[in-house]
């Protein structure tokens, strides 16, 4: 089980989507220079399918995507939540921002429509910087994903 601390509607994290961002706590990555160090501690409320249903009801018609920000402490649970959302709320896309270098082999990529991989490395910058090590992928077909990171770069 994972906990979340807060949520927010965001427009930049996933291109062409109005995204409900869910900040998951207990991050094991501990990236130096992290701008969300408050998410390192395992605090907040349990993130359950019932909580997701409430978010969807609260933002009905306003969001097109739900993004799990973190969850690296339990990727299998993040995948289960993604499966639940696709089954119960098929109109929504599901994204996962992970600090991992690679996608965990123990879960299915196709449970997600978007996946961000890579730890934050301060001197390389975040996704909007051309120098970033992080990558944002969009599902193309099946388990195939296309790198769309360049869509986030500052012009």
What are these language model-derived features?
Residues 1-23, 28, 36-40, 155:
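N-terminal [4Fe-4S]-dependent radical SAM core
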Residues 2-9, 36-95, 101-107:
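Conserved Radical SAM active-site core
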Residues 7-16, 60-61, 78-80, 91-155:
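Auxiliary Fe-S-binding modules of radical SAM enzymes
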Residues 22, 31, 115:
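Conserved, mostly hydrophobic/aromatic
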Residues 24, 68-69, 116:
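Short glycine/serine/threonine-biased micro-segments
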Residues 27, 73, 120:
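Hydrophobic pocket-lining residues within nucleotide cofactor-binding pockets
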